[in-house]
Amino acid sequence: VRRPLPLKTAFRRNLTLTTLTFMILVGYTSPTYAASTPRPKNENIVVHGISTKAVRHLVEVMVSSPSWDHQLARWDSKLCPLVAGAPELFKGVLLSHLYSNAQIVLHGLSKDCEIKNVIIFFSENGQQSFNEILNKYPSLIKGYNSIGLNRDDYEELSRREIEALQADRPVRWYRSTSTEPASGTIVGKDPLSGKLTTSSIDGGSRILQHTQARTTSVIVIIDITEASGATWKQLADYISFVVLAGPKLGENFNAISIMSLYNNRTFQKTAPPAMTPFDSAIIQALYESETAVQSHDEQLEITQSVISRLGSSLHLN
């Protein structure tokens, strides 16, 4: 039986935003990288009736990057969620789904954490809540945990980003990321400019870079009126994908993904009942792919990995 989200009267009123005060995380452990998935021999392979080219496009919007030369960000084991404004019962459902999905790719993840860096906020007016957060934190905590390797970590939000976050929609989100030294990278300081420098222990590579991107915080705001219609499970998996993968805000997603739940900014009755094998393959490929490359190279690797993972269980032609 599909249980729609309860009316907004089921949620606590008059919530404050004091829970959005972040503390700086300390320490970082470089993840272990999996070998790149080889390019498939058949470039015309079809997954769920979708061509390789279309799968690549899906990857680009489901694991998004500000531009092709940026790097894709992912979490390390310091992910620590806080849910505010939801009924106690759904808090448990949401956290259970989020931890279950995260533990597949984040080894060493602990539920016993103190520094909250994933704020999932249920509001009676998502637009108003975002504006309140923006007024209090104009940078949306951007760059708060950066060591200064990349000035992009500190750039102010663009007008386009702010407008997208202010638009009426069931769910809105924003990720803060930090540029970190990649595995095998030495960080130094230029004696004249004082700027941080990077160099590779083994001399470097034409493709591999000296840096990688790490997700440091995520703010998710659910408008409880606009989001109504979905089941708790659907919404929990939708939020889990948002937190773990970083899809593009405002995009319409293919119906094979739980992310199609709110296409066209409204609940879609035809959306999957839960996170799909395609969604899971995207997340696993993201966390197994090479991190020290530009986003377009990594998205290609993720595309190939998704096709490789799903090809044996699907009818491909």
Feature-to-residue mapping (PLM):
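Long, folded non-catalytic interaction modules
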Residues: 82-102, 106-317
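Hydrophobic beta-strand segments of well-ordered beta-sheets in folded domains
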Residues: 43-45, 75-81, 218
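N-terminal secretion/transport leader regions
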Residues: 40-50
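Compositionally biased P/S/T/G-rich terminal and signal peptide-adjacent segments
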Residues: 50-75
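N-terminal secretory signal peptides that target proteins for export/translocation
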Residues: 1-12
